[in-house]
Curated annotation (Swiss-Prot):
Its main location: nucleus. Residues 362-412, 432-472 are annotated as: Disordered. GO terms for cellular component: nuclear body; RecQ family helicase-topoisomerase III complex. Signal peptide: none annotated. The keyword Chloroplast does not apply. It comes from the Eukaryota. This is RecQ-mediated genome instability protein 1. The gene is RMI1. SMART domains: DUF1767 (SM01161).
């Protein structure tokens, strides 16, 4: 059989069977080499054709310099590719996973932290779509360099394919800006590899270049590269829920709307964070006989999340409130300084000792600091028992004690002691000192009620140029005040810590100035009423509360019966969504006066009324402070 006839038949076989096109000069040289390698023996046409195809699989298409892709494909912003194109994969990366964790895994380093992703978190619901693998391929036909994106999962592709693997792209393939959008029906894996590319385009080197790290000169072939024709690999499937129409039709009277705020540990109050869309509070609904399904495709953000990912929790320590801005601290310290100037000295025969343990540099006195106060005192001039002020904040311990001596010249005013206690709580001006304010017995003496000593507790001045009246008003409304002089009905508001300390035995109505720390329950619609549980704080303590139906109805814009009417009409469904988003926006920075009904029998508190602060409340607070 003559060589030209063999060459023509091999060319036809490659084109018809594998859709492979090669230059004639390379094909003739390849056939001659095969015949020489076999000692000039008589090989059948099928054997020659097969060996030529195997040599093509091991050849770098750049050496052939034979264009396959149409001219101008890289210049057109979009288009569609039709036909059969045999291309070479230089490299590929899984862009759905962090490049750093992939590189650490290849290098055999610990990737425990990197493996903690949204896919491994307990709060991910079974109906939520899981991350899908997306491979980005660097392709070439020997002349043109083009990218291929795994637009839909392609089972025949995987990240361990060796550089130089050949594939056939066929059918109608859309492309955008030089990127082929590959689907499973568009890709056929032929196999092969190119030894010269194994080192340059190894996974480790490609990832290192992507991260800007130094490449490892000793990088070797990755495990699995020996497989020329890989088998199918598992793909990450997506669990798709029912349509919006089916979900709305499944709602009944006892649906629970779940506000997934497990990852939200920070409210918008006293926070300058601009990342109000960080927390995804998915609005979902539960059916009586099934697990939950999403009510809407969109998620509703109810509370902004802190910049750091934090595990879900409903228990908080006081360190959480230390993240408030320094600007608020300065405003508070101005008011603290004014209070200290008004405090008369503690008139007693004995000594006043203030001992401060080493305070962490990161601690700042703020309106969010939560301190537990325990004090025992007499109304008259009898001896005062020690007053202890403790905090849950680690490394912070302060004891204020008045001596055991007896009075020699009159009685000691109760408010003097209480103001001294309140001052001692926040007298943390210089955290760098290990010990301070050690007053001897001669520094504080007992005087008559009508002739108080002019000496005051030793204190450091606090300087600030803040003179904004609105900021001063906010600072005054935020300060804890003198718990010893307050009652649960003191205008304009009282404090949660005082409510918890007094432990009322009957149902009590109190007014406090609070903000939402986090949502601890689900938005529910039961028996024709809205309901949601939350944890609120006024800076002195936390309190678990339920929000009344009237409040939620006003925030959402419609009642539960109206909601059932809206869901029946598809045209009114946007109104349902808008109402929930309206509720979200108002909850983000909710900080106002709350009238709370405290029920000691059920250990339950319910927010009945929301009220904004005004000038009248400020005047009431000033009068209370000036008493």
């Amino acid at each position: 059989m003559s060589t030209p006839n063999v060459t023509a038949r091999v060319e036809t076989w490659l084109s018809s069977t594998w859709h492979v096109k090669v230059p004639l000069t390379w094909l003739e040289a390849c056939i001659n080499w095969i015949q020489e390698e076999n000692g000039g023996g008589n090989l059948s046409q099928a054997q020659i054709s097969r060996q030529v195809f195997e040599q093509w699989l091991l050849t770098d298409l750049r050496d052939l310099e034979y264009p396959i892709l149409p001219d101008g494909i890289l210049d057109a912003p979009k288009g569609e590719l039709s036909g059969f194109y045999s291309l070479q994969i230089d490299s590929l990366l899984d862009v759905s996973q962090p490049a750093y964790s992939q590189l650490q895994k290849i290098r055999g380093k610990s990737t425990v932290n990197e493996e903690v992703t949204a896919n491994t978190q307990a709060f991910q619901k079974p109906w939520e779509a899981k991350p899908t693998r997306m491979l980005m391929l660097q392709l070439t036909d020997g002349i043109h360099q083009i990218q291929g994106m795994e637009y839909q999962p392609v089972p025949v592709l995987h990240s361990n394919l060796p550089p130089g693997t050949k594939i056939t792209v066929h059918g109608n393939v859309a492309y955008r800006l030089g990127v082929l959008l590959l689907k499973p029906e568009n890709v056929k894996l032929l196999g092969g590899e190119v030894d010269a590319l194994l080192e340059e385009y190894s996974q480790e080197r490609v990832l290192a270049r992507l991260l800007g790290e130094a490449e490892n000169p000793d990088s070797v072939r990755q495990p699995g590269h020996e497989q020329i024709v890989p088998g199918p690999v598992d793909e990450l499937g997506q669990t798709l829920g029912p349509s919006d129409e089916e979900l709305l039709a499944s709602l009944d009277e006892n649906n629970d709307f779940i506000l997934n705020n497990e990852t939200s540990l920070e409210s918008g109050y006293c926070s300058r964070s601009n990342n109000f869309s960080a927390t995804s509070c998915s609005l979902t609904t539960y059916n009586e006989n099934t697990t939950g399904f999403p009510l809407q495709q969109e998620s509703v953000n109810l509370l902004p999340r802190s910049d750091e990912q934090t595990p879900p929790s409903v228990e908080y320590n006081d360190a959480f409130l230390n993240d408030f801005p320094l600007e608020d601290d300065i405003l508070l310290e101005e008011e603290i300084q004014r209070e200290l100037e008004e405090v008369p000295s503690v008139a007693r025969n004995g000594n006043v000792n203030l001992s401060t343990e080493r305070i962490p540099h990161t601690y700042r006195s703020s309106c969010g600091s939560s301190l537990n106060e325990t004090s025992e005192k007499d109304d008259g001039c009898g001896s005062e028992k020690p007053v202890e002020v403790t905090s849950k904040q680690k490394n912070l311990a302060r004891t204020v004690s008045t001596g055991d001596g007896t009075s020699t010249g009159g009685s000691l005013q109760c408010n003097s002691v209480s103001q001294a206690c309140s001052s001692a709580i926040v007298l943390l001006k210089n955290p760098h000192e290990e010990r301070r304010n050690d007053l001897g017995p001669d520094e504080s003496s007992c005087q008559s009620r009508h002739a108080p000593d002019s000496r005051q507790l030793n204190k450091d001045p606090v300087s600030s140029s803040k003179t904004d009246p609105e900021a001063d008003q906010q600072a005054i409304l935020c300060r804890p005040g003198n718990a010893c002089d307050l009652d649960l009905d003191s205008p304009p508001f009282t404090y949660i810590s005082l409510l918890l300390a007094k432990k009322p035995e009957t149902i009590t109505l109190v007014k406090v100035k609070c903000f939402i720390v986090t949502l601890t329950g689900n938005l529910t619609s039961s028996n024709g009423s809205w309901g949601i549980k939350a944890k609120v704080s006024d800076g002195s303590a936390y309190l678990e509360v339920d929000f009344a139906d009237d409040i939620l109805t006003s925030l959402i814009g419609f009642s539960v019966p109206e909601m059932h009417t809206l869901r029946k009409d598809p045209a009114l469904q946007p109104k349902l969504k808008d109402g929930l988003e309206r509720c979200q926006k108002q909850l983000i920075d909710l900080c106002c006066l709350m009238t709370i009904e405290f029920n000691p029998f059920q250990s339950k508190a319910t927010v009945l009324i929301l009220q904004d602060t005004d000038a009248r409340h400020l005047e009431q607070l000033k009068k209370r402070l000036n008493k």
